[in-house]
Curated annotation (Swiss-Prot):
This protein's record includes keyword Transport: no
Organism from which the protein derives: African swine fever virus (isolate Tick/South Africa/Pretoriuskop Pr4/1996) (ASFV)
Cofactor (UniProt): Zn(2+)
Keyword annotations: Early protein, Metal-binding, Zinc
Function: May participate in a redox cascade for the formation of disulfide bonds in viral proteins.
Protein name per UniProt: Protein A151R
Length: 151
């Protein structure tokens, strides 16, 4: 029963990210493999190869934020150590091996991600405002797997 409640709570957290962000990037080993964006009146789903080239684009007609959250949850659960998400505006976050990246480009941590984001292109990263663990608190999904985080 606790596991089911935990799963539902985690899906709710992801749905909140989907609703508040508008764009969610899915990363495997810190490489963007997919993007889900809300555009106009529907969600769009993009996939990329390791060189950040667009592989496919799909219109998810009829999808709801709850459907999208469940899809992301199932994807994360397959490999919570390597699968991460990045959520777009207004709370822009990137999960990179327990590090967050930051708008202060003087921070060392921003440089690698900035290279990745500019190579992916502005159509993928609508907002390059990134946070850092030195400046804000956050929890990566690998830590959310513990049910007591919700108590």
């Amino acid at each position: 029963m606790m596991a089911l409640l935990h799963k539902e709570k985690l899906i709710e957290c992801i749905e909140n990210e989907v609703l508040s962000g508008g764009t969610v990037l899915l990363l495997v080993k810190n490489i963007v493999v997919s993007e889900i964006s809300y555009m106009g009146d529907s969600y769009k789903y993009f996939t990329f190869n390791a060189n950040h080239d667009l592989k496919s684009k799909e219109d998810l007609k009829g999808a709801t934020s709850k459907n999208i959250a469940k899809m992301i949850y199932n994807w994360i659960i397959k490999n919570p150590q390597n699968n991460k998400i990045w959520s777009g505006e207004p709370r822009t976050q990137i999960y990179f091996e327990n590090d967050l990246y930051h708008t202060n480009y003087n921070h060392e941590c921003i440089k690698d991600f900035w290279n990745v984001s500019t190579s992916v292109g502005p159509c993928i990263f609508n907002d390059r405002s990134i946070w850092c663990t030195k400046c804000t608190s956050f929890y990566p999904f690998t830590n959310i797997m513990s049910p007591n985080i919700f108590q």
